[in-house]
Amino acid sequence: MKLEHPDRLMKRTPLSLAALETHDAFAERHIGPDAASQQAMLDTLGFATRAALIDAVIPASIRRAETLPLGPFAQPLSEAEALAALRELADKNQVFRSYIGQGYYDTHTPAVILRNVLENPAWYTAYTPYQPEISQGRLEALLNFQQMVADLTGLEISNASLLDEATAAAEAMTLLQRVGKPQSNVFYVADDVLPQTLEVIKTRAKPIGIEVKSGPAADAAAANAFGVLLQYPGVNGDVRDYRALADAIHAAGGHVVVAADILALTVLTPPGEWGADVAVGNTQRFGVPMGFGGPHAAYMAVRDEFKRQMPGRLVGVTVDAQGKPALRLALQTREQHIRREKATSNVCTAQALLAIMASMYAVYHGPRGLKTIALRVNRIAALVAAGVKQLGFATVNDTFFDTLTIDTGARTAQIHALANAKRINLRRVSDTRVGISVDETTTRGDLAELLGVFAQAAGGTAPDVDALDAGLADTAALPAGLQRTSAYLTHHVFNRHHSETEMLRYLRSLSDKDLALDRSMIPLGSCTMKLNATSEMLPVTWPEFGRIHPFAPAEQTVGYREMIDQLEQMLVAATGYAAVSLQPNAGSQGEYAGLLIIHAYHESRGESHRNVCLIPASAHGTNPASAHMAGMKVVVVACDAQGNVDIDDLKAKAEQHANDLAAIMITYPSTHGVFEQNVREICEIVHAHGGQVYVDGANMNAMVGLTAPGQFGGDVSHLNLHKTFCIPHGGGGPGVGPVAVGAHLAKFLPNQRSTGYARAEDGIGAVSAAPYGSASILPISWMYIAMMGAKNLTAATETAILNANYIAKRLAPHYPVLYSGPGGLVAHECILDLRPIKDSSGITVDDVAKRLMDYGFHAPTMSFPVPGTLMVEPTESESQEELDRFVAAMIAIRDEIRAVEEGRADREDNPLRHAPHTAAVVTANEWPHAYSREQAAYPVASLVANKYWPPVGRADNAYGDRNLFCSCVPVSDYA
């Protein structure tokens, strides 16, 4: 119910409680334009109502007949009510002291990082740093991450994060397949690798014909494998010397991947020093909560010779137009948005925000602080070992960093029961063994309590911790030959910001360099940069969500699983499908899972030969990259002059491949920003030829409440919760990419059998390390849907379409709108064609993007899906005032271009070619340009009151790739 104007309320008598209550208050804050603004925009478009506009935009044949069936969430909750309801669910979780380990550890998030990174919209609302000039802060933080990982692993170069340790290991496998010996298709996994990692590797290997063998590490050299994966330390705690083994593997023509504990590497010889070619792992224990499995930043580091084969994003150093150091994403030609099915990986969004947290943890503690934490953890583990031995138990491993495997024999069940009574979780290794992994949060009191459990089981008295400590030799459990001697984190950034004052100011200095949603609209097409409301973000830091281990017993995670079940049903309602899995921890992984599900379906019908995937020429690069990873053959379907799928070409190719057609991948609305009229026909053609229909959910923000892929012919879709459902982009992650399926595919949804999570009888293997992927950020989407309710979710979709059409209408006289549907209308985004401008003036789309920075805007999506264009998506969250500000900037830029066209401005010496303009350039003693300083920096009057200054001039991309440098820059270079 919308609140009336206070003056009108005061005149009404009598006032009622109902008249004063509102449950739509959140929706009115989430949706940018108020009723008056919406009507003004509708008037501009020539429509009387929003409903009339929607009727003209969306084909009647696919319109949803019913209101979103959200059940108990059909009516919106207020922010307070939603937080209270989620608190009830959170309180059903039980936060036990976790000693489970297996790749996940409790950790202390420094408060200065919690408040100023994780809870700071300047960091979490930013987009992937494709526009480097306005992304220098997070690029520096990610460069710190790369330096940290390279130093700790002892390898030459690291990427800027991957999704989790298991998928990073799978990516390493495919990397080594590309560079390894061609006569082998075997990848060997040591039997002490994390079980969830092995399962993800098997899932990834099967469709591309890699044979995975697992056994003792000692047998790896004889396996004739192109690659070998070793865990360091092993899952049961052993710290083994693999130097001779690595030499033997190399002598046999193979390569070595090491999954290494990031904290252990501060005290153990790094894998790069004993023969590893690739190192992978998780940085979660560097200040990032366990979060029931994620999100966390995985890492990959490689030898220099493999840098161009490395997946994921890579930050490199270049120079700007003034010759000063500038950071940028390097070697982008490896990535799916350029290489498509030939890309090194389908990964887009990774885990930038979590990588930034982990890097700042290292910056804050420095090398000395990290080593102190590691030595303390190792000391506590040694005290546990000494204590249980004193009580008569034997440890299986004599060498260890933080993990012990203990022979407990017939007393195993009793020990688990006693531990449970004290709210302690131990790892269930077997019926006769338990595992204990300690971490930086383990206290002296925890240690005494833990030893008390074993003492009670043994019928004895717990040893005194101080007495144990006094009698224990130094680093007795770390093999002498594997104790680290090489220096690490020597760069000044890791040795300067150790007081909270210094750290606070460093974080502020970085965030001030960047342009995020807290400053202005980010109109990136196909990215849906909408509001990430504060109330949605608050639960992410609740310990009832953050301190839960992903493999905690089910009875301790009741609230989590209820919330997840509810969110799955919300997404079922939104998509029109029958079931949803939240395991995929990025859109790329949801896409990949969907294709594996399609393959499993065909296989179950005796048609495993179906392997052709039809993909329109306009598709996002992840589509062909994912199809290739799923073992499918990509066949491109042409698009017509209007940007729609060419039906005749589709029919011909469906007929040609009728015997081996697996699927078609379409995006709806299309990547051209249009609701194609014949989408039902497309689905029917593919079904008639034995294929399944994959509908990419990247543009779901134009469909919620109005139409649904599961109702117009889709069989499977992935969603991007970090687009449509308000999880922030985090500067390049985290994301969540649920996979939604029709009833006939539900039994093939992902499982994780290695950890006892069996969701579906014939489910595909795990696609993420944890059963529920990035579980700790799922409350964001739950909150958004609960606070919006069915009616307001639909209103948000309608407003997103209204805003896009308003921008298209206002800018059409200045920039041609490349594609539109009937009546010249678009969906939730529009493509502006700048190609004629280049022909008439020499001004490129890149020039316009950089000039927008001078106006205080992030550029729209450049040259996708059509080179030389800008794709604009305003979302529903932007007000008419902000839309008008963007329109004014674009019109002003068009006037600047016209000056070049008409000869009033030089083709080279003009404000577009030299954009962006930094404060240093504008205030320099010399001004060599024909245009004024004022035109450079303050092209519109509104900037005088609120000016964002890009910290660097235009980055030289070619220089950066020719002179690849991906480590921290010396301070002297900035002088």
Swiss-Prot record:
Chain positions with N6-(pyridoxal phosphate)lysine modification: 723
Biological process annotations from GO: glycine decarboxylation via glycine cleavage system
Known cofactor(s): pyridoxal 5'-phosphate
Gene3D superfamilies: Aspartate Aminotransferase, domain 1, Type I PLP-dependent aspartate aminotransferase-like (Major domain)
InterPro entries: GcvP, GDC-P_C, GDC-P_N, GDC_P, PyrdxlP-dep_Trfase, PyrdxlP-dep_Trfase_major, PyrdxlP-dep_Trfase_small
Keyword terms, alphabetized: Oxidoreductase, Pyridoxal phosphate
Record's catalysed reaction(s): N(6)-[(R)-lipoyl]-L-lysyl-[glycine-cleavage complex H protein] + glycine + H(+) = N(6)-[(R)-S(8)-aminomethyldihydrolipoyl]-L-lysyl-[glycine-cleavage complex H protein] + CO2
Assigned EC number: 1.4.4.2
Membrane as UniProt keyword: no
Domain of life of the native organism: Bacteria
One Pfam family, short name: GDC-P
GO molecular function: glycine binding; glycine dehydrogenase (decarboxylating) activity; pyridoxal phosphate binding
Subunit-structure text: The glycine cleavage system is composed of four proteins: P, T, L and H.
General function of this protein: The glycine cleavage system catalyzes the degradation of glycine. The P protein binds the alpha-amino group of glycine through its pyridoxal phosphate cofactor; CO(2) is released and the remaining methylamine moiety is then transferred to the lipoamide cofactor of the H protein.
PANTHER family in the cross-refs: GLYCINE DEHYDROGENASE (DECARBOXYLATING), MITOCHONDRIAL, GLYCINE DEHYDROGENASE, DECARBOXYLATING
Family in the record: Belongs to the GcvP family.
Name of protein: Glycine dehydrogenase (decarboxylating)
UniProt organism field: Burkholderia thailandensis (strain ATCC 700388 / DSM 13276 / CCUG 48851 / CIP 106301 / E264)
Gene name, Swiss-Prot/TrEMBL: gcvP
